[in-house]
């Protein structure tokens, strides 16, 4: 594909852009996209849950290009929202626990994209990412989101379980990344 495709990206030519990065046929590998649990203060028992639009956009672009894609919305999957106390009793967790998320990861996952939006949650998300890599050592972990975009060198240094970071708007960067790895 043309290496300058991002500069030439025009919504009127979306199909031709996607066709340049189509998934291989009959490939059973999966791209899993995950929004992890949210962190709340110790005295908070719920927080409004928004839709994971970033992951939805990523998933939509990848699926349109033929990649098998699954989304785990650990913050918003449970209705009503589940809030539990952290194991160290210092904060609350809204959404699925680390263990519940690990159980939802498809064993055919080749790439796991994880949304790291808020720096204030990094202290809890980093050990979770390390748990993923321990259970699934062959999964390629890609971080995205505001936190990842702001301080990528720090994240890669502090969490070697993360293999790559995609900065900024990730829809087409993740598509090209996936194409090059598949």
PLM ranges: what are they?
Residues 28-30, 68:
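Residues that mark the start of a beta-strand
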Residues 30-49, 140:
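Short glycine-rich His-centered loop
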Residues 61-182:
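Glycine-rich beta-alpha loop elements in corrinoid/cobalamin-binding modules
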């Amino acid at each position: 594909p043309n290496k300058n495709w991002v500069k030439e990206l025009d919504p009127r030519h979306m199909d031709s852009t996607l066709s340049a990065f189509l998934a291989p046929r009959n490939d059973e590998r999966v791209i899993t996209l995950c929004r992890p649990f949210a962190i709340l203060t110790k005295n908070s028992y719920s927080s409004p849950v928004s839709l994971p639009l970033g992951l939805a956009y990523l998933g939509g672009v990848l699926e349109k290009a033929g990649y098998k894609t699954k989304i785990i919305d650990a913050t918003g999957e449970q209705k009503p929202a589940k809030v539990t106390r952290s194991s160290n009793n210092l904060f609350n967790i809204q959404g699925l626990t680390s263990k519940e998320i690990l159980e939802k990861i498809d064993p055919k996952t080749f790439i796991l994209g994880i949304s790291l939006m808020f720096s204030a949650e990094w202290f809890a998300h980093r050990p979770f990412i390390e748990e993923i890599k321990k259970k699934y050592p062959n999964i390629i972990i890609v971080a995205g989101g505001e936190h990842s975009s702001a301080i990528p060198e720090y994240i890669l240094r502090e969490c070697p379980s993360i293999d790559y970071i995609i900065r900024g708007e990730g829809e087409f960067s993740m598509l090209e990344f996936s194409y090059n790895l598949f």
